[in-house]
Amino acid sequence: MEHNKAGSSGQCPVMHGGLTSASMSNMDWWPKALNLDILHQHDSKTNPLGADFNYREELKKLDVEALKRDLKALMTNSQEWWPADWGHYGGLMIRMAWHSAGTYRIADGRGGGGTGNQRFAPLNSWPDNANLDKARRLLWPIKQKYGNKISWADLMILAGNMAYESMGLKTFGFAFGREDIWHPEKDIYWGSEKEWLAKSGGENSRYSGQRDLENPLAAVMMGLIYVNPEGVDGNPDPLKTAQDMRVTFARMAMNDEETVALTAGGHTVGKAHGNGKASNLGPDPEGAELHEQGLGWNNHTSRGIGRNTVTSGIEGAWTTHPTRWDNEYFYLLLSYEWQLTKSPAGAWQWEPVNIKEEDKPVDVEDPSIRYNPMMTDADMALKIDPEYRKISERFYKDPAYFSEVFARAWFKLTHRDMGPKARYFGPDVPAEDLIWQDPVPAGRKDYDVNAVKAKIAASGLSISEMVSTAWDSARTFRGSDKRGGANGARIRLAPQKDWEGNEPARLGKVLAVLEKIAAESGISIADTIVLAGNVGIEQAAKAAGVNVTVPFAPGRGDATIEQTDVESFEVLEPLADGFRNWQKKHYVVTPEEMLLDKAQLLRLTAPEMTVLIGGMRVLGTNYGGSQHGVFTDRVGALTNDFFVNLTDMSYTWKPTGRNSYEIVERKSGKVKWTATRVDLVFGSNSILRAYAEVYAQDDNKEKFVKDFVAAWTKVMNADRFDLV
């Protein structure tokens, strides 16, 4: 072995060429390849706490009141390295919590504050999150003290809650239960722009048509949480900004009243920072030098802290007393005329005309100095937009009502991605059930499961009907925001009962049979639907020569239409389901990519996705009875035929359309089967083919059945947080 060349050029002979930082990855070489990495995230290999760590058990040891006291003390314990504005960190902590929770979007349930992802790229380095690294460093001594008993995710949101309480707001409540991740998510699409704060209309823009924001995005620019505070594309126009606000907040499931409350309540305290030159700031945390130790936006050319801090570039406080909860925001916004100006950093902002001296906030360091308050374009939208103005006027006239609406909206903002109340923990969990929590009443557990199974088996329903209905009921689950799933049996309610992908005619027939059995047995329809799917699988396994009992956990309840926000559930409608070989229409995204997205939301691994596809095909569960991918002559038997025939080199594959193929016998030229892209990707993609070959092996027929049952049970129980 010769190392002289590497050594003589100053390169390390051991690591030279190793994949440690910059290098061409497989995705760089083959950008159209499926990114299966999204199915393999956040496992024990990256978690320093180990596979046996149980956060809920750790929470039971937490002294909640002591933690809250420490957080309140932190608010006024100003540090020299990053001084608190007016001696109070409340505004900074609220912004940190807001921007942690505020990445949530209802379309796919991704984002939000439930994982502590603000600690990692890209969020830790978004322009809109500038200097929030300082907030997390201020929290570190408290995190260090309480250790595993409090996650970063919970701590960041709780810090925002305590900030509001320390300034006089009566909050609605708080729930612990957010578990930390240990590396950035690989499944969240933040946009395709190649630069921060890219304007609409440019390359890879998230906008099309008449300012139509790409789904599932809920922010107007790459690197922002919601809207541009200076105006659309940085051009002040409150009416246009109002439209951006309406879209982005709606994509977080917030209505106009909640939007006004959150905007005003967020700006009642704290300030924006732009008293200096943005050009003096160093790189963001991910781009900073090693010795910066994960801190970004450092100013090494001027003071850069206190009154000289630069963050957004906008400068000033919104209210006269920015460290207390009051109604001054609406007083100033609605009582004064406002004119457009620029901050010292060159950012557009609005300042009042002829404001009284006593209405001006004091300097963050010297109370003898007063400055004009300011408003962003988003704030001015609350005054100029007619609907927002009506709400603002009501809040101004009724401060108590404003405080109540804000407290509830803040709770919704910071808890929306946590899922049902079964996941909530702690002494401050509100007793009230809120419709956005998708409440489900508890179901019975004390009944004879085998007796119900016998009734289902004798009902005349086919294996396909039973399995398809159970799958359709459970497949709505999203591991992102913990919504959907079989619990509640909302498949029988609007809007789900009418979704095209649920085949309403077939669904209605099956539900009529199962509802009768549920009523006779005194159990929930939700349990009966899942149990029917299990019965179908057991029958299919027996037909394949394998005796198996599918695990079942009773206790699901039946939700009512009054407990269901129909509009909110519309976003759960499947546009495609590769497991049932169905697409509502053709999309830019390929069918196999949509399958991958669905599998990730169901929290499936690639092997689990693979075995489910193979099983669902031979069970005859395709949408509309389609024969695509049904590579078997024994439909209804849980065999590994799908994989055996997919990997058989006796066949060749020919495209017949955009998403259709024929599988042809090489010798005779006879068409044996038809398929879709979703079917053939398990023979085309090298990783998926490796899994398919495992299940095609002669010695793995029983393993296939057992693995299918395990993956099926995982999906059926995905929303059973009461079992944890």
Swiss-Prot record:
Tryptophyl-tyrosyl-methioninium (Trp-Tyr) (with M-252) cross-link, renumbered residues: 98-226
UniProt-annotated site: Transition state stabilizer, residues: 95
Binding-site list for heme b: 267
GO CC terms in record: cytosol
Cystine residue pairs: none
Record's protein name: Catalase-peroxidase
Reactions it catalyzes: H2O2 + AH2 = A + 2 H2O; 2 H2O2 = O2 + 2 H2O
HAMAP family: Catal_peroxid
A Pfam family per the record: peroxidase
Record key words, sorted: Heme, Hydrogen peroxide, Iron, Metal-binding, Oxidoreductase, Peroxidase
The protein's role, per its UniProt record: Bifunctional enzyme with both catalase and broad-spectrum peroxidase activity.
SUPFAM superfamilies named in the record: Heme-dependent peroxidases (SSF48113)
Record-stated family: Belongs to the peroxidase family. Peroxidase/catalase subfamily.
EC number: 1.11.1.21
Crosslink (Tryptophyl-tyrosyl-methioninium (Tyr-Met) (with W-98)) position: 226-252
Claim: Heme is one of the keywords in the record: yes
Name of the gene this protein is made from: katG
UniProt cofactor note: Binds 1 heme b (iron(II)-protoporphyrin IX) group per dimer.
Subunit structure: Homodimer or homotetramer.
InterPro entries: Catalase_peroxidase, Haem_peroxidase, Haem_peroxidase_sf, Peroxidases_AS
GO process annotations (BP): cellular response to hydrogen peroxide; hydrogen peroxide catabolic process
CDD domains associated with the record: catalase_peroxidase_1, catalase_peroxidase_2
Active site: 99
Entry-linked Gene3D superfamilies: 1.10.520.10, Peroxidase, domain 2
